[in-house]
Amino acid sequence: GLVALADQAKLDTAPTPYHLGFLLGPRINAGGRVGNADLGARLLMSENSEEAEGLAALLETLNTERREIEEDVCANAFKQAEERGLDKPLVWAAGENWHPGVVGIVASRLKEASRRPAVVIGIDAGEGKGSGRSITGIDLGAAIQNLVEQGVLLKGGGHKMAAGLTVKTQEIEIAMEKLSSLIKQKGIDDKEPPSLHLDSVLMPNAATIELVEHLEKAGPYGAGAPSPRFVFANMQIIFAKRVGEKHLKFSFGDSRERILDGIAFDAFKSAIGETIEQHSGRRFHLAGRLELNEWQGRRSVQLRLDDAALLQAQAA
């Protein structure tokens, strides 16, 4: 089953935790999100190659459908959230007929973009069913359970980093205001700029294949043990090119002429994509995670970009 799924994902190298989490995992889950929940389990249990290939192809189709639905909901949710402000203690959005199978994914995207707890709610038949994602230090599940006990929400619960809720449509605004207040009491306020945890400063010549291999052996990583995030300070952008409509491929280096490749997914959903694309040789602080890229039998290190800061020109 996994071999058939890897073929559909065009994965031709030994899978890493990243591949499992971001290539194979979403395809296995696609059945539960927009199709039949048992498809992934049937694929993994299949001992017949023909059956496995058929199930993998079906999951690939459903995953494509899931992405299309997700992109539509994501665009609308981001528009709403940006109008309210991505610097609020809680970032949230709600819409009619938003597919329940993608609201959690969209909430994750909002959380990553804002670095705030985020909730996305799909409205249907007078009720809103939503999913939330949190950040370190904010117990979203407990906050939602608090609102259930107060009678603000019909039901809800979860854990520190993720939770679900059900609320009457006419109560959504009030419920989100109360949830935002609870989160603010825990230490997030709308005047505090979002922060990004950084583990170490690194120079391009230290970003070796051996280093990345050692980091991979220390995994797998997750919410409780995130993969290390490095800063490359005062780097000059050498090359930048848009990949598709949303992503950015680039390379950067220091004065010692050591050049490293980078990739920024969904870069053009913020100012990062356009700013780096139109770099004109300017210098940036770059923050992200290191990974191995394999292409045509060649292995190299690349930076998966999380954030960037343009260095302001210094006065002479």
Question: What is the predicted function of each stretch?
Answer:
Residues E51-A93, I138, N146-A316:
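Mid-to-C-terminal polyanion-binding domains and interfaces
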